[in-house]
Amino acid sequence: MSEILQVRNLTKNYGGARGLSDVTLALESGKIIGLLGSNGSGKTTLLKMIAGILQPTSGTITVDGMTVGTETKKIVSYLPERTYLNSWMRIRDIIDYFEDFYEDFDRANAMRMLASLGVNENAKLRTLSKGTREQVQLVLVMSRRAKIYLLDEPIAGVDPVAREFILETILSNRTPNSMILISTHLIADVEKVLDSFVFIRDGKLLMKQDVEKLRESGKTVDELFREVYRCL
């Protein structure tokens, strides 16, 4: 598979603090990749810069050969850690909004997944449980036919049933040419869907590795993560 995302010498400063420090990374299409680190490690900062929401202090990001900007936003689907949807909106209005705003939005696929959740399209977002709201937002993001999906902590704060639905939704909506980058600190829960992973800490890239190669050595991603972080 070809490299769909290239990050070179990426640094992001917030006043006197450094959010990312000289990160260089290349990720391939057709993979589900874990961006793994503790809270405050720089995961969200990196995702926001790939999505074009934050500008780097220095360094470059290219998505499918293009510098991050208006054109790359058309092929990048981003799930933020915190919702940006108004709680008073009805589900059908949110679907209409996504269909109007994104040319690659697959309404039929979104409706199919929402039906499997038992979500009434006339329901207001605020009437749904937290877990169901999280699932609805993921359905919307994964119903775009994007080349890159950026998912920021998609399974945080939801119950085990909701987590299983979220992971199944990610798996069932992957395509051979898309790349899914999942940011999380809940490594044991997500590692079963990963093809490879990246460890990040204090804004610095620690390592990148294939999951299958790690398993051949007799370790899990969660075990390696604990070992690496204990040594630092």
Model-derived segments and spans:
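Walker A (P-loop) phosphate-binding loop of ABC-type ATPase nucleotide-binding domains
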Residues: 38-42
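Helix-to-loop junction immediately C-terminal to a conserved catalytic motif
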Residues: 51
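Conserved ABC transporter NBD signature motif
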Residues: 59-72
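ABC-family P-loop ATPase nucleotide-binding domains
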Residues: 81-136
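Catalytic Walker B motif of ABC-type/P-loop ATPase nucleotide-binding domains
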Residues: 149-153, 158
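Helical segment within the ABC ATPase nucleotide-binding domain
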Residues: 163-176
